[in-house]
Amino acid sequence: MKKVMLVFGTRPEAIKMAPLVKAFAQFPETFETIVCVTGQHREMLDQVLHIFDITPDYDLNIMKQGQDLYDVTSRVLLGMRDVLREAQPDVVLVHGDTTTSTAAALAAFYQQIPVGHVEAGLRTHNIYSPWPEEMNRQITGRIATYNFSPTPLSRRNLLEEKVSEQSITVTGNTVIDALYWVVDKIKGDEHLSAELKSVLATAGYDVDRLSVNGQQSTDNRQRSRRLVLITGHRRENFGDGFIQMCTAIRDLAEKYPDVDFVYPMHLNPNVRKPIQEVFVGLDKLSLGEGWGEAGNMFFIEPLEYLSFVYLMEKSTLVLTDSGGIQEEAPGLGKPVLVMRDTTERPEALEAGTVKLVGTNHDKIVTEVSRLLDDAAYYDAMSKAVNPYGDGKACERIVNFIKAI
């Protein structure tokens, strides 16, 4: 029996690793599945664990008020030392580009335990964009014994870095496995759908605003209103870039009074402060009240994964600086405009599901306007094939680990 330890600490990692935990757990005669979480994103991590019904075997609980990257790295590294000595896994699986993943991979390397890197080979080739994620994934990739690349391009990136071809398996992205699991769960449970609708109302947005004659329509053109879903929290955008993003969103909300703009606000004060500077009077609004003359700009509380997918499924398009959403939203047929200057997911650019708009005010306004005004342009993006997989990435990873 192989001992497989999966280590993660943030909400995006948890979403992408949760279906893999489930996949290994289906073979108790072959694998002892060990889950270690670091708590790098404490509250949001716990929400995902609850959704997928995962109870960690180890919880480092590293989150402290005001900690920086030095603190996170050192706490994960020291915490993993004792966990690895006790559990003695045969392989440690980490995900992507977080500080948790890099520190956990380094800890495993120090004990000469093989590391499997899920979502390996993504590159922007600029170590400061995104920061620190680009360097994190490059370091983790150097440590990894096994590389699970989501696409042929990410495999090519690794080969160009002289990574052994035998160590690389193209699997698709596990985020699509998670997305399909959640969408099926929501669609198959009317009570859950009603509960998520209530959760959104409590967070500050009433999805009935999108209905026609009291009925929810899946066709954007049949709705009385359309929805632009917004997320933004990247460190490299803090400062002038983030102010430009916020100003563009404000101007779009004023330009399109018949479109709702919904922004679940990240807990980070570096995100909330500039939003309150650009959207004057925001702090005076009551729950569920939209900002602006048309009352169509909604800043709501952060959403757990189920609620976010529920809202994303109802959206017309997504405006984001997130990495994972570039993979998820096209799986639901939603065009994505990325408020970053680079992306480690060029496959989406090539496929036409994603477009870079940076943090430039005019470019953001122009591209959102084009998607809202030009039906043919919208259809070209929304109907493009998602390059990130078929929902069977976890199965491929499990089969690889079985065979080693």
Question: Where are the regions that the model predicts?
Answer:
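Nucleotide-activated sugar donor-binding and catalytic core shared by glycosyltransferases
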Residues: 1-263, 270-404
